[in-house]
């Protein structure tokens, strides 16, 4: 045979599926790093966009264009009444007069409210200055100065305590300025909890003319902006009316988005179907349950655990970095921070190993009691191989006893030292208690002396007063007798 026969020749491999157009959390699925390609698909759950209407609504979010005048809580309560759902929440309060992006979470999606409330926000604001500026470029310059970490105190009329706090303005741009009407329009990207009203007042102070906020609109809240399928309250009401009267789901499905839209920015870890329900019950994700993972995951990063169908299971804290995930063959991948998926949507798959199955069979045959404990019918081999938890504890206790006998002289020394230290501490405590008692006694005596002194002085004053009154009366009598 010639040497050429043993050369590995290139093969025409088929092109991998293009997942750049796949929806939500499955986008660019092929670019995830593969830990294992082997798993058993379970016919449970469904793709977020193909859920039945009831579960689609109960795990949905609405990117609402909040109208001016009603408060955020009122708007959310109206949506709850319109959609007839159990609970609703929103992504951060907007003042009654403020309009724009308000993310309304429904039922299961309310578990993501906290993460959205802490996310960054973007606003377009109209500021009214109290006087004309000498140089129109001053407004842009002072806006640039007001970036980074700023001290802010909540406005006079606010629902929170007016404490000084630090808030960050990431970026701001002046859009337009009319010096004749003293009006300026600017855009700002800032941290959650920033007061734009206070920012406008600070702008006026910097410019030396004074100013206040005229109008405000939020254009982005967390993951969603005003360009991401924003709807009005009328749309929500019309969609529910159309469904009630014509049974047409399309309008409702178009205004409500799956909760996975809020998690698109998180790094992903794909979980085997058999491990999903265990994670829903709060179990940590281990290496055997891992299918794919994203590049650039660092230790303690906030990540999202997803199923092979693209459903969000939970928001979790990574316990391994990408490098560890590639090299480790056992260990904890992530611990659950906030579970999103319903329990028992996927079937239970724990307790299905060979030992667990054998134990189950032996219980049925009467070779173990109903609690899985050894009885008279248990085979000797099982007793040798399988060590239950209480036996393990007994064995550890016996080993501890042997260790204790060896370490008795050491312990005696340690105990004597500890006793000495304790006696010293007790003596110090006694001295302290004596001092305290003495101080209390002295204080009491001083107080009593002071009270006695005060009483004596009062008595003397009364006597003096009485004597002076008696003297006056005698003088009057003598005068009358002379007359």
UniProtKB/Swiss-Prot annotation:
Signal peptide: none annotated. It is an enzyme of class 5 (isomerase). Keywords: Cell cycle, Cell division, Centromere, Chromosome, Cytoplasm, Cytoskeleton, DNA-binding, Isomerase, Isopeptide bond, Microtubule, Mitosis, Nucleus, Phosphoprotein, Repeat, Ribonucleoprotein, Ribosome biogenesis, RNA-binding, rRNA processing, Ubl conjugation. The active site is at residue 95. Its EC number is 5.4.99.-. One of its GO terms (biological process) is mRNA pseudouridine synthesis. It catalyses: uridine in 5S rRNA = pseudouridine in 5S rRNA; uridine in snRNA = pseudouridine in snRNA; a uridine in mRNA = a pseudouridine in mRNA. Residues 266-341 form the PUA domain. Catalytic subunit of H/ACA small nucleolar ribonucleoprotein (H/ACA snoRNP) complex, which catalyzes pseudouridylation of rRNA. This involves the isomerization of uridine such that the ribose is subsequently attached to C5, instead of the normal N1. Pseudouridine ('psi') residues may serve to stabilize the conformation of rRNAs and play a central role in ribosomal RNA processing. The H/ACA snoRNP complex also mediates pseudouridylation of other types of RNAs. Catalyzes pseudouridylation at position 93 in U2 snRNA. This is H/ACA ribonucleoprotein complex subunit CBF5. The lineage of its organism: Eukaryota, Fungi, Dikarya, Ascomycota, Saccharomycotina. The gene is CBF5.
């Amino acid at each position: 045979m010639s040497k050429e026969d043993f050369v590995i020749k290139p093969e025409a491999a088929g092109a991998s599926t293009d997942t750049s157009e796949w929806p939500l959390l499955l986008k660019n699925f092929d670019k995830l790093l593969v830990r294992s390609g082997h798993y058993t698909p379970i016919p449970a759950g469904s793709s977020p966009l193909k859920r039945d209407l009831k579960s689609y609504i109960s795990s949905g979010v609405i990117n609402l264009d909040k109208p001016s005048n009603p408060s955020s809580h009122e708007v959310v309560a109206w949506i709850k009444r319109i959609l007839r759902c159990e609970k609703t929440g929103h992504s951060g309060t907007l003042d009654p007069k403020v309009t724009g992006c308000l993310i309304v979470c429904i039922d299961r999606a309310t578990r993501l409210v906290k993460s959205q409330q802490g996310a960054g926000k973007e606003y377009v604001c109209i500021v009214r200055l109290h006087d004309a500026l000498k140089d129109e470029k001053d407004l842009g310059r002072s806006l640039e100065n007001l970036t980074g970490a700023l001290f802010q105190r909540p406005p006079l009329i606010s629902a929170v305590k007016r404490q000084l706090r630090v808030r960050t303005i990431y970026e701001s741009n002046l859009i337009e300025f009319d010096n004749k009407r003293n009006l300026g329009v600017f855009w700002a990207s800032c941290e959650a909890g920033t007061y734009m009203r206070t920012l406008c007042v600070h702008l006026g102070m910097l410019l030396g003319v004074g100013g206040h906020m005229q109008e405000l609109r939020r254009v982005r809240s967390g993951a969603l902006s005003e360009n991401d399928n924003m709807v009005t309250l009328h749309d929500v009401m019309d969609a529910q009316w159309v469904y009630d009267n014509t049974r047409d789901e399309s309008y409702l499905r178009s205004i409500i988005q799956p909760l996975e839209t809020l998690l698109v920015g998180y790094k992903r870890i794909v979980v085997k179907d058999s491990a999903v329900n265990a994670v829903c019950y709060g179990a940590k994700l281990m290496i055997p349950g891992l299918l794919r993972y994203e590049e650039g995951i660092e230790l303690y990063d906030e990540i999202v655990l997803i199923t092979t169908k693209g459903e969000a299971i939970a928001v979790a804290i990574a316990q391994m970095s990408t490098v560890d995930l590639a090299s480790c063959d056992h260990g904890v991948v992530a611990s659950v921070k906030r579970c999103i998926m319903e329990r028992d949507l996927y079937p239970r798959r724990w307790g299905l190993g060979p030992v667990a199955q054998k134990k189950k069979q032996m219980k049925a045959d009467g070779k173990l009691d109903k609690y899985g404990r050894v009885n008279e019918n248990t085979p000797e081999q099982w007793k040798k191989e399988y060590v239950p938890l209480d036996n393990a504890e007994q064995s550890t206790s016996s080993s501890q006893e042997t260790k204790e006998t060896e370490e008795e002289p050491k312990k005696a020394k340690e105990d004597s030292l500890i006793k000495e230290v304790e006696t010293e501490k007790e003596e110090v405590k006694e001295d302290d208690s004596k001092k305290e008692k003495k101080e209390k006694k002295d204080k009491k005596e001083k107080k009593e002396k002071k009270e006695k002194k005060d009483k004596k002085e009062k008595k003397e004053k009364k006597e003096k007063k009485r004597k002076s009154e008696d003297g006056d009366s005698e003088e009057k009598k003598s005068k009358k007798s002379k007359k």
